[in-house]
C-alpha cells in the first residue's frame, strides 16, 4: 500500500500556537532547491500537492497533509536560502527549530538532499540538531537520475559511510530517489510506514509497572 497515496492538504500555519491537533506526524525538510516539493508530489502521486518552484525558499510556512491512515505528513520550510529579508529568515529558522524540537506528535524526519551535493554543512547541522530528539531520520538522495548508475552506487556508499557515526547512535537510513524516474517510492513507503507501525505498537502496548 502506498502510504502517501491520496494525501490531502489539511492546513498551513506560520506560528507554533496554530499547530493543529493530530495523531502522528512525519516531516519533510531539506535545503532550498533540494527537490523536497517534487519528492512529496511523487510520493503522493499528485502533480501539485506541494508547490514546486524554480525559486528557492518558496515554502515559507508549515504545511500539513492528511494521509489515508489518518496520520499526517508535514512539509517544512527549506533551509539555506539567504535571499530573503533577515527577519523573515530568522522567523523560518525559529519556526523550524521549535517545531522539530518540541512537537510531540512528530515521530520521524525525512531529510531531502540533492544526490549530487549530499551532506552539505547545513545538512550536517540539521542531523546534529535532530539527533537530540532521538527520533529516526530517513534521507532521500533526490535527483538521482542526474547521476549515472555507477555514480549512484558510489554516492550511496559514500553517504552511508559518512553517516556511520550517526547510525551508531540513532535510527538513520538513506536511499536514492528520483522524482523524474519514479525511483525509490516503495523503499520510502516501507521505511516511513515502519515508523507509524512502531509508534502504533508502542501506543497499544500495556505500560510497565
Swiss-Prot record:
The lineage of its organism: Bacteria, Pseudomonadati, Pseudomonadota, Betaproteobacteria, Neisseriales. Belongs to the TRAFAC class TrmE-Era-EngA-EngB-Septin-like GTPase superfamily. EngB GTPase family. Residues 22-198 form the EngB-type G domain. Mg(2+) binds at residues 37, 59. PANTHER family: ENGB-TYPE G DOMAIN-CONTAINING PROTEIN, MSS1/TRME-RELATED GTP-BINDING PROTEIN. One of its GO terms (cellular component) is cytosol. The keyword Cell membrane does not apply. Keywords: Cell cycle, Cell division, GTP-binding, Magnesium, Metal-binding, Nucleotide-binding, Septation. Its cofactor is Mg(2+). HAMAP family: GTPase_EngB. Necessary for normal cell division and for the maintenance of normal septation. It comes from Neisseria gonorrhoeae. NCBIfam families: GTPase_YsxC (TIGR03598). This is Probable GTP-binding protein EngB. One of its GO terms (molecular function) is metal ion binding. GO terms for biological process: division septum assembly. The keyword Cell division applies.
Amino acid at each position: 500500500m502506498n502510504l502517501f497515496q491520496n494525501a490531502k492538504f489539511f492546513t498551513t500555519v506560520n506560528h507554533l500556537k496554530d499547530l493543529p491537533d493530530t495523531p502522528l506526524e512525519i516531516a519533510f525538510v531539506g535545503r532550498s532547491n533540494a527537490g523536497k516539493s517534487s519528492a512529496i508530489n511523487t510520493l503522493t502521486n499528485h502533480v501539485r500537492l506541494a508547490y514546486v518552484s524554480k525559486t528557492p525558499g518558496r515554502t515559507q510556512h508549515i504545511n500539513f497533509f492528511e494521509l489515508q491512515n489518518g496520520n499526517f505528513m508535514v512539509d517544512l520550510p527549506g533551509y539555506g536560502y539567504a535571499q530573503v529579508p533577515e527577519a523573515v529568515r530568522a522567523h523560518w529558522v525559529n519556526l523550524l527549530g521549535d517545531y522539530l524540537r518540541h512537537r510531540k506528535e512528530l515521530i520521524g524526519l525525512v531529510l531531502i538532499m540533492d544526490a549530487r551535493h549530499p551532506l552539505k554543512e547545513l545538512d550536517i547541522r540539521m542531523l546534529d540538531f535532530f539527533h537530540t530528539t532521538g527520533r529516526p531520520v530517513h534521507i532521500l538522495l533526490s535527483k538521482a537520475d542526474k547521476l549515472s548508475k555507477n555514480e549512484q552506487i558510489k554516492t550511496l556508499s559514500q553517504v552511508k559511510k559518512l553517516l556511520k557515526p550517526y547510525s551508531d547512535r540513532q535510527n538513520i537510513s538513506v536511499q536514492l530517489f528520483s522524482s523524474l524516474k519514479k525511483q525509490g517510492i516503495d523503499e520510502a513507503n516501507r521505511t516511513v510506514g515502519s515508523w507509524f507501525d512502531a509508534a502504533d505498537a508502542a501506543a497499544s502496548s500495556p505500560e510497565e509497572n
